[in-house]
Amino acid sequence: MELATLVTLFVSGLLMSFTGYALYTAFGQPSQQLRDPFEEHGNELK
């Protein structure tokens, strides 16, 4: 394969891995440990 193809595949793989990890953190098991700033402040915005 050409160098440009390998670099493109590598960068695409990194991007897909980062996106998958971000989605897992946002919606998967670790998301239960995230704090919700709106719940902490309640109805102070009214």
From Swiss-Prot:
It comes from the Eukaryota. The chain crosses the membrane at residues 5-27. It is found in: Plastid membrane. It comes from Cuscuta obtusiflora (Peruvian dodder). The keyword S-adenosyl-L-methionine does not apply. The gene is psbN. One of its GO terms (biological process) is photosynthesis. This is Protein PsbN. It holds the Pfam family PsbN.
